[in-house]
Amino acid sequence: NLFNPAAGGLLFVTLCWPQLVFAYPATFTNPEVFGEVTARTTNSIAYVLSVGSVPSTDMTSVMLGLHPGPMGTLNGLVLLACMLYLAARGSIRLWQPLITLGVVAVFAAFFPRAAYSSLASMYYEIFGTAALFGTIFMLSEPVTGATREEGRLLSSIVAGLLLVGYNYFGAYQQGILFVLLLMNIINHHID
């Protein structure tokens, strides 16, 4: 595959209906499945960070995924367990997502997007956005990724830099999607 099909589909939906893609039901609400939707929606931590505000969600809730955002991308404990499982099975190389997330963490520590501590900035950038999900399941997958070890290392670093750049200057909340599609193109040139 030249592009990750899931990312391509999500990109299409994001570009066509961004107001619907990034509207999340408030935590612990029961949105209607059929008929008119009356559930209250709220913004994700990624949006709060993108406008330079401090997230009001505490760090424990962030780690447990008890905050609005894309379904399946926010429970940090589950995602970390998945990463370790995939690495133990040999499906991914553990160092690939760790390098990408390390680049994001370093930039978040030195250049936080809002007025809070370096540690909180790193934490929210990694666990409050879809970065952890994207680096584990999409950037590390072997089909659209680089094939040589040197290429994987370079790809992980470049992905981290692009993710930081998009998170700080991009137009949409979830920069990992755009970074993934760019890396799909770049990886073919890295090898």
Give residue ranges: language-model regions.
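Conserved mixed alpha/beta catalytic, RNA-binding, or beta-rich assembly cores of soluble enzyme
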Residues: 76, 87-117
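Hydrophobic alpha-helical segments embedded in the membrane of multi-pass proteins
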Residues: 77-81, 98-106, 125-138, 153-161
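Alpha-helical transmembrane segments and their membrane-interface exit regions
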Residues: 13-15, 103-109, 131-137, 180-190
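Membrane-helix interface "capping/anchor" motifs
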Residues: 1-3, 87-99, 142-153
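Hydrophobic alpha-helical transmembrane segments in multi-pass integral membrane proteins
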Residues: 20, 24-25, 111-116, 121, ...
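Loop-to-transmembrane alpha-helix initiation sites
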Residues: 2-6, 122-131, 152-154, 170-183
